[in-house]
Amino acid sequence: MDNLIEQYFAEIRKKNLSLNTIDAYRRDIKKFHEFLDEKGEKLREVDVITIMSYVQYLQKNGRANSSIVRNIVSIRNFFKYLEIKGIMDDNPVTQYEMPKIRRNFPDILTIEEVEKLLMGPDGNTDKGIRDKAMLEIMYATGMKVTELLNLTIYDINLKLSYIKCRGIKNKERIIPMGSYAVKCLEIYLKVRTKLNVQNIDYLFFNLQGDKMTRQGFWKIIKQYAQESGIKKKINAYTLRHSFAVHLLQNGADIKTIQELLGHSDMATTQIYSGMYRKTRIAEVYKKTHPRA
């Protein structure tokens, strides 16, 4: 089975998926492989009962429905590949009905909380200037962390106030920037040369001059959230989610938000409508209920 897994991943690497997506697929299939080994079950023996048994195993181990669905999708795609190659007669996962996902929406920052977060970096230090520019761009554009960290100096146009961003499958999109983000970038570019000891084209890098990692950015946003006294669960995508919901709150149409976020599927963007409704209901309740 190990050889088949490697052949499969050699195939899907050609699809220009992100490394994070491929890594997630690999973890899912590896875990399923370990499950089969423990059961002493061969790949060709897998049927819908095996899949149901595996789902129960994941549930017992505390996996959320969303995680289980992703696991099953990964396995289904693997078996689809095996079926196409003639290794399996059919795909056992197609007979399995996916569990419905109860969406637990991530926490969204209020505009006041975003202001607190963005005021966190110390504008008198090179690190603070860099951090401020990164956070302002994240909130101004709603781009993904990987998109932010892959930006080069050639992707920004301060004169016309836009950023050129490359998303999934290297698809390019142009995102406008607000005046705050532009101003922070102008200040940052003055100190960037001093920080760029490795002479690289990436717009942002760590204090050693290397390309910043996702973990490095996560530590930055976590630090300022704690220092700002924000109690909500913060992650590297909180500003992206808040960007989308705040646009909805201020009347932006869902199609425009889809284009700004780089979603290929409108259904993904419409999740933010549910997040907005949840936030809006909570706000109305707090303002209007006498015992809120």
Swiss-Prot record:
An example Gene Ontology CC term for this record: cytoplasm
Domain named Core-binding (CB): residues: 1-83
Alphabetized SUPFAM superfamilies for the sequence: DNA breaking-rejoining enzymes (SSF56349)
Gene Ontology biological-process annotations: cell division; chromosome segregation; DNA recombination
GO molecular function: DNA binding; site-specific recombinase activity
UniProt superkingdom: Bacteria
Active site positions, chain numbering: K169, R240, H263, Y272 (o-(3'-phospho-dna)-tyrosine intermediate)
Localization of this protein: Cytoplasm
Keyword Coiled coil found: no
Keywords associated with the record: Cell cycle, Cell division, Chromosome partition, Cytoplasm, DNA integration, DNA recombination, DNA-binding
Extent of the signal sequence: none
Domain Tyr recombinase: 104-286
Role this protein plays: Site-specific tyrosine recombinase, which acts by catalyzing the cutting and rejoining of the recombining DNA molecules.
UniProt miscellaneous comment: Although strongly related to XerD, it lacks the Arg-His residues of the Arg-His-Arg-His (R-H-R-H) sandwich residues that are clustered with it.
Entry's family note: Belongs to the 'phage' integrase family.
Protein name in the entry: Putative tyrosine recombinase CA_C2066
Upper taxonomic lineage: Bacteria, Bacillati, Bacillota, Clostridia, Eubacteriales
